[in-house]
Amino acid sequence: MLVTLTQSQARVIGVLLEKEVTTPEQYPLSLNSVTTACNQKSNREPVMELTELEVQNTLDELHAKNLIFEQSGSRATRYKHRFCNTEFSDLQLTPQQLAIICVMLLRGPQTPGELRTRAQRMAGFTHVDEVEKALNELMDVNGEQLVVRLEREPGKRESRYAQQFYKDTNEVISHEPAIASKSSQPNASNTTVATNDTAQEARICALEDTVTQLRCELEQLKQTLDELTR
C-alpha cells in the first residue's frame, strides 16, 4: 500500500534520501542537520521555515510509521530513513528512480528536462529519454502508481510529473496517453536553447550544492564547539 505523507513528512524523507547519497559522510543526520536541510533555500520548493520542535514532531510521526530509524550515540540521536531500499522496506527503487522521487519530494512537480538536471547529482542521466523511461516505470511499481503526469500548463512545452506520497490539491492529473520518449524530435534551435538552459541550471545546482555542503560543515563545527563548551 502506498504510504501517505504530510508536507513536512515528505520534506524530511526527501532530505534523508538526498543526504544519504550526496553527503554520506554526514549520514545518518542529527536533528539539527535535518532541520537545516529542511529549511535550506537551495534545491527546495517551497522554502520552509520549520522549527526544531516541528521537525522533531515530524520525525516522531515518521518513526511511528516505521519510515525512519533512530540511531542513538554518545553525542546525539541521529536519523536514517527506512522509506525504500532497506531490508525493512517493501519499496525497492533503482538509483535513477530514487533520485526522481527525491527531487519531487523536495521540489514538487517536475518536467523530464528539469529532472535530468536536478537529479544528476544523485543518479546520472545521459539523456532525457532515460528520465522518461524511469518515470514510466514509476507509474507502475508492483501495481502502485508512485508518479503521475499532470496536465500541461499553458505556454509550457513539457508536462510535469508529480510523486503520489504527498499530494498537492492544486495538481491536476493528465488523462492523455503517455507520450513515447522519441515520438517527436525538436528542431535544432530548440535543442540549442534547451542545452544552454540545462548547462546553466547545472552550474547553478553545482553552486547550490557547494553552499549546502559548506552550511552542513558549519553546522557540524558549531555542534562540536557546543559540545566542547558544555
Curated annotation (Swiss-Prot):
InterPro entries, from UniProt?
DUF480 (IPR007432), WH-like_DNA-bd_sf (IPR036388), WH_DNA-bd_sf (IPR036390)
What family is this?
Answer: Belongs to the UPF0502 family.
Protein name listed in UniProt: UPF0502 protein Patl_1161
